[in-house]
Amino acid sequence: MRFFLSFFIIFISSVLFSFGIPNEILNFGSAIAGFSGLVLVYYALLNCGSHKRAAFLYGFFVSFVHLMSSFWLAFFEDFAIFTLGASTLAYFFIAMPFGFLLYHSLQKRENLRPFFFAAIWLLWEFAKSTGFLAYPWGTAPMICFNLKPFIQFVDITGVWGLSFIVPLIAACLGEALQTYAYSANSKAFFKGLTEIKSPLIFTAFLVLIINIYGITILSIEMKPATFLNTVIVQQNTDPWDNSQFEENIKTSQALSRKAIFSANKKPDLIVWSESSLIVPYKDNEDFYGILPYDDPFTRFLADTDTPIIVGSPYIDGKKQYNAAYLLSPEGKILDIYSKIQLVPFAEYIPFIDNPLVVRFFDKLVGFSSGWNPGTEYKVFGIKNSEGKTVNFTVPICFEDAFPAVCLNLHNAGSEVLINITNDSWSKTKSAEYQHFVVAHFRAIELRTTLVRSTNSGYSVVVDPKGKIISDMPLFEAESVYTEVPVYGHKKTFYASYKDWLPIMMFLILIFNIFLEKRRAKTARF
């Protein structure tokens, strides 16, 4: 196949896969578009003709999907040069070695190459979603939101199971497309299919088992151990606008009172979003005792007589943290959790103690400070209206997109994940829904309830099967009083054994490389 044709197919596949991910037209994406895009990726790489071409084509695919689906990163104020520009360029080069490996996997026997292709794809998505530079967007699981029975098995494998089975299905369909393209007639096509029947039958059987498992899980009724009556506030204001500081707090207070009044019932907990109090609450309690002037924050707490989760900076000596506070109705700090997984180069700049790094960032974006990463996986606890203690954790912003962060928070003893987020800067529906889709897998992986309180969307409550219990429209000032089901703390297979699947796939590939080298060495003698 000529390079131009391969490039054109990769371009089409990038567009299709981007439509598979939640976007401005299809709020929750399209599995059909996503799978179609992956089939074309397989077909293009299979026929591109060389490792170098495959590396370039896959680098283009990854970077272009990133650019199309995460274009809203350009709205991250002063950081667009990093969040969109540098990241797009970086993904092109980082993905190239995986393109090389994918092409290498396609040189194996027809019956084996779909499995090796899927294994390498899984390792790419694992690498992309892990570590300081991690960004778990633009991945295969994101096209599967509407396939509820199909995604339930992530409580065994984590989302890595989807990162394997989705490209495996696409690879099998790609093999069928390859057979069709090189068949003179239907008889030759069906004869060709018999030559690749092993991966086709195995994959079909695996998909059947996965769906039977999912249907079974969805049919089992889960009874909550108790409920946490929660007011979720979506103030739809910009916390970065210092001129609106008081108005933002007053809006959040008014929305909280509105939800309580509508329910005519005292809540167990109020949840405000990330950065709702931009002046650090700790050491500034007196400040919040007089502001806002006509409705001070601490008086509001006393009026509602309810604990609150609220996002506010936390300063400890010279270190600053993006934090979530649990405050009592009296305004006392009951506990603080500091965000661990920070946005690279936006919230956290590595080696910032180095004068050269300071000068570089001062020159480039006009400042060189940021948050420090937290170090402790905290679990908060309060008593609900039934007198039962409910333990929960508060991943901040895009921490709910990271399996490892939420898994460690859950394993610390959490019964509910309560995420607080500020995504208003994105200004797009697709950003809000993408974040939600990535995050909702945590509920299924850990079989726990997920609550998301955001300042503009998507504020939602998700049950342990990924079903939406309650939500609010995007970019509207709104609040809701909801009974959050609490199912008690338990560990799923994935919570117990963590990232066992990518580790196993990595070891299999290393063993295969060892065998290849051994065979090559034997063949020379």
Curated annotation (Swiss-Prot):
TM region(s), chain numbering: 25-45, 56-76, 81-101, 115-135, 153-173, 200-220, 495-515
One GO term of the biological process aspect: lipoprotein biosynthetic process
Coiled-coil regions, chain positions: none
Keywords: Acyltransferase, Cell inner membrane, Cell membrane, Membrane, Transferase, Transmembrane, Transmembrane helix
Signal peptide: none
HAMAP family: Lnt (MF_01148)
Protein name (database record): Apolipoprotein N-acyltransferase 2
Upper classification of the organism: Bacteria, Pseudomonadati, Spirochaetota, Spirochaetia, Spirochaetales
